[in-house]
């Protein structure tokens, strides 16, 4: 323990060791986008669904803040204050009145700029990891408040499961989701910028009438029933037309997934990852194999949902 010149030790005390958190990516089962507001944002109504494609984030005490990223898309990510995980560390430290002296190590599986909120997931994981590492015992409501300051998708990465999101997506209500749903995720060869997709949606709406969704009640009913065949025709994303406009290859990928046996396919969020809902785990394996050989995407992954939000990974010998 260090001691300051005035004899105060408490504020410098931090436990040693590390904290590792697993955090899921998300698929938007339903995404309705309101018209652009005066502040530049759009009102959203969305059904978030956390899936078993996870990033693993380890935070350790250090002499200064640092960030290292490995895995899926690591070469495309900044490792400084431009990264949302770095901003999360600074925000948490500011919240509790400390310096953000931690090292962050991120092992990524969630695609970068893929519409699955990978950056938001990593930010949520840093909040949870620092809360554990520094033994802060902050309540979940404090973590949710900090998460909402970081971005619209960060609160859901904390929440996990399935949830109805409103506002900019940060206001969440838990949705009952019976059963496990089976997904095949097709990663595109390049990413899409979320602001660019919103801008394209605004442009499409200025010149025409891209499809608008009905209210999400039937989607919630299908989730409560736990029936993938009931859910499949209800999947909808008002941003999909804009994503396909910017990356026309997505149309081929969506068609190929359904032809391979998926019940339905959808662009996740702002894209360009395509998510295919399958009847069973066996069907997901078949669809994955066929999509892998179809030449319409870079990588294919199988996932299930819903899964929990950001959670500390217990170290050996500690209770869950």
Curated annotation (Swiss-Prot):
**Annotated pathway:** Isoprenoid biosynthesis; isopentenyl diphosphate biosynthesis via DXP pathway; isopentenyl diphosphate from 1-deoxy-D-xylulose 5-phosphate: step 3/6
Which residues of this protein are catalytic? 26, 153
Question: What residues bind ATP, as annotated?
Answer: 111-121
Q: What is its EC number?
A: 2.7.1.148
State the Gene Ontology terms under molecular function. Answer: 4-(cytidine 5'-diphospho)-2-C-methyl-D-erythritol kinase activity; ATP binding
Q: Has UniProt tagged this entry with the keyword ATP-binding?
A: yes
- Which cysteines share a disulfide bond? none
Q: Name one GO biological process term.
A: terpenoid biosynthetic process
Q: Which family does it belong to?
A: Belongs to the GHMP kinase family. IspE subfamily.
State the name under which the record lists this protein: 4-diphosphocytidyl-2-C-methyl-D-erythritol kinase
Q: Which organism is it from?
A: Mycobacterium ulcerans (strain Agy99)
Query: Which gene name belongs to this protein?
Result: ispE
């Amino acid at each position: 323990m260090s001691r300051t010149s005035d004899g105060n030790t408490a504020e410098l005390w931090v436990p040693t060791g590390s904290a590792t958190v697993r955090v899921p990516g998300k698929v938007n089962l339903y995404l309705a986008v309101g018209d652009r507001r005066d502040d530049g944002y759009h009102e959203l109504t969305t059904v978030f669904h956390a899936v078993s494609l996870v990033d693993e984030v380890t935070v350790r005490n250090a002499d200064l803040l640092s960030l290292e990223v490995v895995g899926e898309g690591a070469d495309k990510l900044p490792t400084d204050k431009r990264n949302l995980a770095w901003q999360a560390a600074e925000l948490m430290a500011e919240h509790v009145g400390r310096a953000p002296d931690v090292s962050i190590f991120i092992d990524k599986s969630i695609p970068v700029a893929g519409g699955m909120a990978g950056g938001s997931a990593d930010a949520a994981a840093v909040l949870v990891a620092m809360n554990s590492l520094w033994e802060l015992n902050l309540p979940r409501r404090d973590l949710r408040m900090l998460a909402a300051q970081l971005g619209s998708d960060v609160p859901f990465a904390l929440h996990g499961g399935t949830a109805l999101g409103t506002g900019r997506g940060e206001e969440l209500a838990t949705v009952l989701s019976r059963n496990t749903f089976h997904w095949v995720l097709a990663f595109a060869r390049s990413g899409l910028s979320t602001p660019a997709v919103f801008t394209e949606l605004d442009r499409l709406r200025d010149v025409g009438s891209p499809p608008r969704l009905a209210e999400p009640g039937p989607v919630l009913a299908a989730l409560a029933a736990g029936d993938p065949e009931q859910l499949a025709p209800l999947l909808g994303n008002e941003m999909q037309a804009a994503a396909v406009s910017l990356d026309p290859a997505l149309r081929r990928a969506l068609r190929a997934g359904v032809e391979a046996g998926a019940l339905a396919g959808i662009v996740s969020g702002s894209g360009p990852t395509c998510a295919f809902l399958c009847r069973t785990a066996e069907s997901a394996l078949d669809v994955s194999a066929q999509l892998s050989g179809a030449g319409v995407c870079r990588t294919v992954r199988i996932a299930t949902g819903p899964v929990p939000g950001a959670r500390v990974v217990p170290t050996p010998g500690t209770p869950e």
